[in-house]
Amino acid sequence: MALDLLVVSAGSLALKVLRVTPLITTTILLVNRLAQYFALSTFLPPHTSPKKIDHVGAAFQHWLQTVVPRVWTGVISIVLFTRVALILNLFVRPDDLAGSNARFLYGVGLFLSFAHLSVAPKMLKFEKRMMSPETVPHVAMELLAGWMKVNNIRFWIVDVPFWVVGVWATLEGLKA
């Protein structure tokens, strides 16, 4: 069933915006992940001397307790917005996408938008322990190192492919 509404008629600006939205949102998420890596790796060696780990660890915990609640809502909102855009791209004017891989790619993108959930519980355990007032600073830094390993794997296995699929789906969707 196609949602052939006048506002999304073939060639309309609304349809073009819909087709481009996965590219925009996956790029935002990828840049967020890169910024996250550079921000968090600053607290770890070689950028931080092991001699300063207790001082830096305490500052890191305070920073994390402040930044996570501020950033979390925005990231979740963008992920949800991306999913809605991908679902709409699957069902709005699907006949326009015949002869291209766009619909398939929007579906792959939707799958990848959920793929990070496989590591989310482990990452949330790290985050809770890092932010806990009972966690001593040097342990928080050890937890951060472990979290970074899991996050780096997620970045290369999920986030980069998610972005590539977003780019590819957009290109396919616009040329269809």
UniProtKB/Swiss-Prot annotation:
Keywords, sorted A to Z: Membrane, Transmembrane, Transmembrane helix
Membrane association type: Multi-pass membrane protein
Induction: Expression is positively regulated by the oxaleimides biosynthesis cluster-specific transcription factor poxB.
Superkingdom classification of source: Eukaryota
Regions crossing the membrane: 5-25, 71-91, 104-124, 155-175
Main location: membrane
Pathway the protein acts in: Secondary metabolite biosynthesis
Compartments where located: Membrane
Entry GO CC: membrane
Function statement: Part of the gene cluster that mediates the biosynthesis of oxaleimides, cytotoxic compounds containing an unusual disubstituted succinimide moiety. The first step of the pathway is provided by the HR-PKS poxF that serves in a new mode of collaborative biosynthesis with the PKS-NRPS poxE, by providing the olefin containing amino acid substrate via the synthesis of an ACP-bound dec-4-enoate.
Name of the protein in its database record: Oxaleimides biosynthesis cluster protein N
Source species: Penicillium oxalicum (strain 114-2 / CGMCC 5302)
Record lineage: Eukaryota, Fungi, Dikarya, Ascomycota, Pezizomycotina
